[in-house]
Amino acid sequence: MATTTQPQNILMDEPLNLPNNSAHNNNYGNINANIRTFAGMSMHMHPARLNSLEFLHKPRRLSNVKLHRLPQDELQRNTDMNKGMYFNGKQVHAHHPFINSGANFNAHHQDVSKLGEEEDEISPLSHDNFQYESEENGNPSPPIYKKSGELVKSSLKRRSKSLPITPKSIFNKTGSKSKHVNLDHVDTRLLQRSKSVHFDRVLPIKLFNENEKPIDVGKQMVQQDVLNFKHKPLTRLSALNGGSDSVPIEDLLSENNQNEYGDTWLQNPKGVFLFGTNSNNRRNKKKKFKLSDDDSDIENDNDSDDAINRLVRQQDKDQAHLAHGLKNLLINDDDDYLETRTNSAKSGANLFIGNSKRIVGLYNKNFPILSDRNRKSLKLNIFLNLSRGRPVFLQEITLLTGFHNMVIIGKVFVKNIYFDKKIIVRYTWDAWRTFHESECVYFSNANGILPGSNMDIFKFSIDDIHNPNDKDSNISQLEFCIQYLTWGVDRSRKEYWDNNDSANYKIDVVTNETRTGPTTDVNDNYEMKHSLFRNPFH
């Protein structure tokens, strides 16, 4: 008769009391079984060496894999399994009537039993009684102290007392029509709000440059009122008929508008707007053509001598003006620069009304005069930049005045290196603490001005004239430079800058303190007429 021996504990040499569990017997075999030899003789089995890992509870594998279950079903099943909640120390399943309404309880009752079987197959430990320790449940965790006696603070943040303690989810889950719920039997985890974050999809995005700070971007948003990254069309307020509709610049450039409103645009007694040029130049040129057309009328006119004298004086002023622009263009040292600035200040004494205020317009500070009415200066500027081989340079800049706003308009010449071009005017009103960018738009090619030069003309507009340092001041200091981006023949990126020989273009912009409508002394239409782009070689 075979004999069995109780296995001994390897460490304590005491008999082990193994549980009488069929599951263990089936899985791990009967360790008390006898081993018979091939001769039919029984042989006593020595106690096997036991490993402590064998006593760990190992979950059984699934008998059949649920391959037909959809991912949505798996997600719902896992969600229901993780909804193990406790009320008054007793575990309540996720489909308890307190959590779900009574209408859906019977429908899910059968699914609950099936889920329970699958839970046993996957992990029988899922039914272990585990509760979150909280002060509300009366089981506060014991305090922990360091060796120094200092209390260790918990890194887990408790629910804020300022949050409402009755979210709508509690009322929806109770199934009760009454809004009064006894919170003593409600798990505190149900009272915690979700920490999900919602991002608005319509928020504008502001791109930061390398040297910009968030406070600078905030100032720009205040000044601009809104963030708008789309290119603004080049338009002007219709000051011709007294309306407030926007009129494109292309319509103002047409010859019909120039001829129709030519007489109105020439009525300006003051006449000084751009860089100290006089509005009477065009009127005198008109008289010059009349003198050349009919010589007999001049001889018979009693005022013919006065007209000739005025014409001679105007020609002398034009020659002096051209020499002054050439001197500014050819500055090579500081002494000449200081001398030029002194002469410019003396010659610009007529720009002041009284003793303190200057007339509306643009006043250059460190670069020559670029007015579309002084065609000799424009012509000289173009040839000088072409002789230096510059692929991009400022051709002219002027101020358009209207009834309610003012816009700075400029033209840029660029070398036609590649078809794809991007010209950006980067400007600032506060000495580069913040800056803005205005993208230029294509205007025309330069064959009408410089045939065979392979140049294109782009135009830009700056319409946010302001003084960030003093909002009550009518003088703003503009500083800008021009960036030219294109591609080379080898598809390499090309970048060029026109920054006035590393000094940037600096301009004082003088605007009216208040512009509520047209005035009798200054006609804004005159400025609009003479600020249009023209060919300086005609």
UniProtKB/Swiss-Prot annotation:
Pfam families: CBM_21 (PF03370). GO terms for biological process: regulation of glycogen biosynthetic process. Residues 384-508 form the CBM21 domain. Keywords: Phosphoprotein. The keyword Phosphoprotein applies. InterPro entries: CBM21_dom (IPR005036), CBM21_dom_sf (IPR038175), Gip2/Pig2 (IPR016717), PP1_regulatory_subunit_3 (IPR050782). It comes from the Eukaryota. GO terms for cellular component: cytoplasm; protein phosphatase type 1 complex. The modification Phosphoserine is found at residues 162, 196, 296, 304. Gene3D superfamilies: Carbohydrate binding type-21 domain. GO terms for molecular function: glycogen binding; protein phosphatase 1 binding; protein phosphatase regulator activity. The keyword Phosphoprotein applies. Present with 996 molecules/cell in log phase SD medium. Interacts with glycogen synthase 2 (GSY2); possibly also interacts with phosphatase 1 (GLC7). This is GSY2-interacting protein PIG2. The lineage of its organism: Eukaryota, Fungi, Dikarya, Ascomycota, Saccharomycotina.
